[in-house]
Amino acid sequence: MEKIHEISAEHLSLERVADIIYNNYQLRLSEDARQRIVRCRKYLDEKIARSEVPIYGVTTGFGSLCNISISKHQLSQLQINLMMSHACGCGDRVPRDIVRIMLLLKIQSLSYGYSGCQLVTVERLIDFFNAGVCPIVYMQGSVGASGDLVPLAHLCLPLVGLGEVEFEGRQMSGAELLQLKHWESIALASKEGLALLNGTQNMAAFGCWAIIKAKQLSQWADCIAALSLDAYNGRIEAFYHAVHAVRPHKGQLDTAARISQLLAGSQIIEKSKTHVQDPYSFRCIPQVHGTVKDTLQYVEHVLDTEINAATDNPTVCPDEDLVISAGNFHGEPIALPMDFLTLAMSELANISERRTYKLVSGTRGLPSFLVANPGVNSGFMITQYTAASIVSQSKGLCMPASADSIPTSQGQEDHVSMGANAGTKLYTVVNNTERVLAIELFNAAQALEFRRPEQTSPVLERLVANYRQVVPFISDDVVMYPYIAKSVEFLQTQTLPDTNPTL
């Protein structure tokens, strides 16, 4: 049965965004949303007809050209010119899933009736989404104020038969798409180009994608860390509730409880130990993983607000009879949190790599580099090198993009957020963290075999059994990179162990 999501003023959660994108929902406008869009457009048309006062971006030029008035017969051409001139993207393409989130968020933002778009324009964006049309958008070009002008220009050019798209497995021009689908080119009305291009949907889409993936990785990090702790013959006392009750950060409490749940019933963890404590990368898992959880919760809260907002300019307020040029396009509210999340995810990878290092170090009864005959075999030596390389790259990406600002548009736009750069850096670091965690899993599962016949917990034994269906125990040196790739794929496709995680 076809799954339908109705675009309305009801709250749109990140969980719902993930459901729509990854479970192939179709979109449709609620009747209330249709009425709001039509009402706002009607008000704007009437405002233009009766007012002699210039309205920024509606009857004037853009940016530093805001004082140049545009005659009424040029208003439609002004919108086309805006879209063409602002399509200056460079670099790699924005991934398909993120482009689809951009489309969804742009439709949602326009549906509130504060932007002045025509109903037919919003409906065509919905047509794109429902048909699986993916406009080709580029990673570089947005300074994060006035919104995401460059990527949103590429997103919306196909409305008028320009730009390029991917559709049904091939790349084609916007004109070819319209011909193929028998769609008319949209005749943009006044202000529409600005409504389409102004907004934070590119930044917000990267943030949504990152939160959705990072929450999964945060759960995986706990599972893998628990496996590493047991394979390293670590101690459980550092996870006792009494320890964390006296420093009750929520993420810390949740992580300690979850590690304890994951290791419940382990023969290895219950054995008496000769060592009195573990290295920080094991002992401080609750404090580090927990802080990442708290960061995720904060950033999700910010993005939750952003994706339920109208972020273009000027803001059209029919009830107040106002068209106000302001700054809701500025990306600062999400640029800073995305930089924060980049740092948090880099730290999650950082501590993971440290555990991998300990596993291959030939201590706690484990052989050097986790291979039975070290010397003739190098074993897992270089997996740690790879993790170290990736972690180092992520650390280099932790310089906050939002710390920089370069004036644009002849100084009229003299402070920008660089939030799009924060988003693309975050995208890289989240993917890097997934790879580092996959490498830790590869090492931890290998190390566990040297504890046999003792067993870890039933939950983790099931996890390892599933993992062994795709990645074997390594007895002698083999080409390793396919197993790293399979480990990454395992994290992407395998269901997390059922321990009722809180985040």
Where are these regions (language model features)?
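Generic short alpha-helical segment signal, independent of protein family or function
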Residues: 67-70, 83-91, 103, 107-110, ...
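Cysteine-centered functional microenvironments
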Residues: 137-142, 319, 323
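FAD-binding glycine-rich core of flavoenzymes that anchor FAD
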Residues: 114-140
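FAD-binding core of FAD-dependent oxidoreductases
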Residues: 56-70, 74-78, 85-110, 138-160, ...
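Alpha/propeptide regions of enzymes that mature by internal proteolysis
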Residues: 93, 113-118, 219
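N-terminal flexible segment immediately upstream of the FAD-binding catalytic core
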Residues: 1-53, 58, 62-64, 69-90, ...
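Conserved, non-catalytic sequence blocks in retroelement Pol enzymes and Pol-derived host proteins
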Residues: 114, 143-145, 375
